[in-house]
Every structure is written in C-alpha cells, then in structure tokens.
Amino acid sequence: EIMPSLVGSEMCIRDRKKRRLNMNTGFIKVSAVSPRVTVANVEKNLQNALKTVKAESESGSSLIVFPELYLTAYTCGDLFLQDALIQSALDALIKFSKETAYSDAVICIGLPLRVSSRLYNCAAVLQSGAILGIVPKTYIPNYNEYYEKRWFASSEKVNCSSVIIDDEEVPFGSNLLFTLSSGAVLGVEICEDLWVPVPPSSELCLNGADIIANLSASNEAVTKNDYRKNIISVQSAKCFCAYVYASSGVGESSTDLVFSGACTIAENGAILSESERFAFDGSSASAFIDFEKLNSERVRNGSFSDNNEILRENDFTVIPAYVNEAEYDNVKRSFYPYPFVPSNESERELRCGEILSIQSAGLAKRLAHTGLKKAVIGISGGLDSTLALLVAVKAMEMLSLPNENIICVTMPGFGTTDMTYNNAVELIKALNTTFKEIDIKPACLRHMSDIGHDSDIHDITYENTQARERTQILMDISNKVGGILVGTGDLSELALGWCTYNADHMSMYGVNCSVPKTLVRHLVRFEAEKLGGEIEQILLRVLATPVSPELLPPDENGNIKQKTEDKLGPYEVHDFYLYYFLRFGTKPQKLLFMASRAFSGKYSEEQLKEWLRLFIKRFFISQFKRSCLPDGPKVGSVSLSPRGDFRMPSDAEFTEWLKF
C-alpha cells in the first residue's frame, strides 16, 4: 500500500534542472496513444507502453498521453480488489519510469493506486525517469454500464498532498499543474471528469493550464463518437486550451462493451487530429499545439480573466517539467492560406449569406435611424463598390424601398478604362438603380491649375486630386438628395492604408470596413450565382478585373496600367498576415513560417519576407487613417474600428516588428 507522505501539505518537489529550450517557436508536439491492451496482463501492457514511448519520443513528441488504467486495462472488474493486480501495477509504474529515463517527453499513463486504504483511478505523470505527480480521478461514474464506485474513490476523498513511491516523494492530488515551457502548462483529468457540467479541466485552465490531457476509457455506442468529439471540441473552445484525449482500445474486455481506441486532439474548438477507431494493433493521434495562440486568446478575452478572478483557487501545485518546443522545420502542421474564407463550400455559402445580412442590416438600421430613404454610392466597376451596391440593394429590400432610391454615380477620371466603365454602367442599370455620371477630369484639371500643379506630373497629388474630387461630389449629392453616402473601402485597404485620406477613406457609413479583399471576391461571387442571368455575367466580369484605383492613365491599348497587387503584393498574402497579426498577435518570425507553409510552391520565402516587411510598415504608418474611420458593421473576428476592436497610437514605431 502506498502511504501518504509525512510532509503533509508542505510540498517538497525535487530539484529539477530547467532545460534550455531549443527555440521559442510556440509549438509543442503532443500525442494521444492507445496501444494494444490486454486485460489484467500488466507486463504485456508495460512492454507495449515502452515500445510506444520509444516510437513517439523518436518522432519528437513532447507529451504522450495513454488511456485510463492502461497498465491493467480498464475492464478488470472485481480484479481491482486483488492485491496482486494493484501491486503489479505499482511495480510496472516504477519500472516504466526507470526505463523511459532516456526520454524528455512528459508521459501520462493510467493505473490503479491504493493510498490510505482507498483505491484511486490515477494518471501518473512522468519525465526523464522521475514520477512528477499522480492525479486521481474526481468524478467516479456509477450509472448505466459504469460501476466504478464499486472499486474506486474520488479525489475528493484524498487527505494527503504527496505519497512515497520507490522511496521518492511524489505530489498527489487533482490540483497539480505541470509547466511544459515558458508558455505552456499541463493539467490532467480522467474520462468522466470531462462529461460533468463543470469539468476539473475548467478549473485547471483558470489556474493556468492551457493543455489538458484526458486519460479515458470510453466505450462505443451509436452516435457516441460524434458527441464525444463535440464535447472535447467545445471544452477546448470554452477554456482556450488544447485537449489531448486518449481512450482505451479493442483489447479491453468485450463481455458487455466495445472500446475503439479513439484518440482526439483539439485546439481552441478545432479538431487537429484524430485516430482510426477499432484498430486491433492500437491507434494514435499527433498534432503540433500552438500554445502562443491559446495564450493570445486568453489575454484578449476579458471574460476569461473575470471568470478566473471569481473562481480561481489558490492551492494548486505547479511542478516543473520542461520540454523542448518544436523547431519550425519539424512542425508538421499545415495552414490554410485563406483564413477569412471557409474551405468547405457549404459553410462558405452560409458564411457569405450571413455576412451580407449583417452588412445590409447595418445600413438599413442607419437609414431608418436617420429617417433618410436614399443611399449614394460611387460605382467604379471594381470589386469593393460592386459589393457595396449589392449590400445597398439588400438594405432597400429590408426597408421595402425601391432600388431607384440608390443613387449610383460613376465618375470617369484620367485612369478610367472602358472595361470598368462599362461594368459600372451595366450593373447600375441591371439593378434598376438611379444612374448618374459626372466626368471629374475638368474639375481636377481646374483644381490642379489653381494649386499650381502640373497635370503632366503623375504623382501623389495628381492621384489624390481625383480621389478627393470624387468624395466631394458624392458628399454633396448626398446632401442634395437627402441620402447617406455609403463607403466602399474594405478591411485590407484599411490595414495597408491603401486609401486617400479624407477621400475614399471617408463616407457616412462604410459597409465593407471589416470585410477583407479575399472575402469580398467570394461575397460578390455568391451574389452572382444567386442572382443569375445578366447580373451574374456582369459580376463575373467585375471579378475578372484587376484590382486598381485607376488614378493613373491606362496603357497604350487602353488597359489598366496601375495594378494594386503589382505595387503591394498579393492581397491573399496580406490578408493572411492581417488575420494572424490581429487575431492572435502572432510574432513576425512565426508569421513568416506559417505563410511559407500556407503558400508553399506559390511564393518564395524571400517574396513572403518582402511582403511581410511591407505589411508591417504600411500597417503602422497608416494608423492615423484608421483613427478617424466612419461607422460601419463588424462582420467577423477581425476588425480595425478605433471605437471597438483596435486601438493603437498613430505614432508608434514598427522597428521591433522588423526583427526577423
């Protein structure tokens, strides 16, 4: 029998030399494993566990999680009341610890342990030949097919804080946390603990854990797998944590139940990896956890901190168990290149419909509030103004107002091409909106003459003269007809400062202000497919048009010469940077690594590095434009509204962000 330590509540934790981390990448490789298990054959299970640790350690795993009661098997029944089985499990744990001393990985393995005349269902946490701690199960199921209270006591019955195993004092309790790195902390719970309304993992996370290991023995039943994955996913989302779940496999007794060896790894609501089920030779799942992203989520979510302050307990014991973070080259994790756009087609369609509803409802509310019944939009034949027009049409429908109440103004300038002009005119007429055309060239020439600027010098003054002339016209028409000037600029342009201050930067309500360029395309395409016919053909031509402000004259063939992406780089790359930079505060070196994976084979690392530098510089120097943005609706998790989502001084330096 394991006796409680005489130390009582005072924890004597052995001195452990803190390992020097090889790299501050923010990634840790974790594995949930369910090797072949044999009921009551401890030696065979031990050997399988040793083989598994060797394989996982060689693959670079820093955390290896076995199933519940793995050393004995979960389905031993009343054999748990036999001294021979309990002693064999303890002996196996000691041997397992010594024979895995070569591994720096933190290992969680399940076994029954008797302490002070009570039997506990436990998870042992080991590293480098040392047993770091023993965590007993808290919630002991005793319903339906479960009869665990027949054998096991809850951690609530524990009356000691450490035990002696192999002449070493080992922390014992459900209040243990294990530091894996400078930013990652491990907490442990067992099977049923997850299925209660307030799992121990919630408390563990509030006290600092951001990776949860669950050693489980979850039998299969129809629909149970989906439900199980759902609660794993939801718990990881609620707690902003990674969840590493390993369940017993088909080697368990099939007298009444069948176990599948389900292994699942989730991170902040997303399933990163899951194993094959019902594999006779065992199963496993591995993933690279981005704990820096989890920490960022917690820092940004005020309610998590509030919950922490209200419910946090102060009697948790933190045990050092430092592991190496994965080097970037070894991180086997892919990154979807379009984080603003769902990869699944059906989900993408639902998202597009919802975003358009948010945009149009925002505009409709503003019109209703002001009592104005008309909307004024400058239509260029490009993507952004096209989307704004489609939103305005839906807003009018909400308000039961005719499309004629949308005043569409096309304002040809020095860079306007026949292609964009025709797209604009045809779309305005096809949607039955009110068409108005004003040639801005005479006014711009007069203005440049007034300020003494040579109109043959095509510099920033030449370009911005046109942009501000257009905005002045639109503002005045709005006053004249009693309407709202609808802004067309998108989130990507705001991030890069690709707008003229007090020109297209300004409006009375900006419907696209939190829609990035990559998403604008999908929204327009979604509406094209929905509307069909002539309108669809016009919208498809708009989608095929290069992105351009058209402020410089066309080439000799009348085609667009000034192409935005030739100057800035691809919007798909900038949107990728924008999402992770704002959403998670991702550091530039890591951002470059992620982009290299996301756009592998499409852009070189040198190109991505050049565009990242450009993104950072333009993002910082353009904050003054974002500090005075018009109102506009937030549609997703990333927004640059100075009133809500993003507050930054306009004169901040970007030097620290260029150190990569």
Give residue ranges: language-model regions.
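Helix N-cap / beta->alpha transition motif
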Residues: 4, 288-290, 439
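Active-site micro-motifs of SAM-dependent methyltransferase domains
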Residues: 13, 71, 196, 442-445, ...
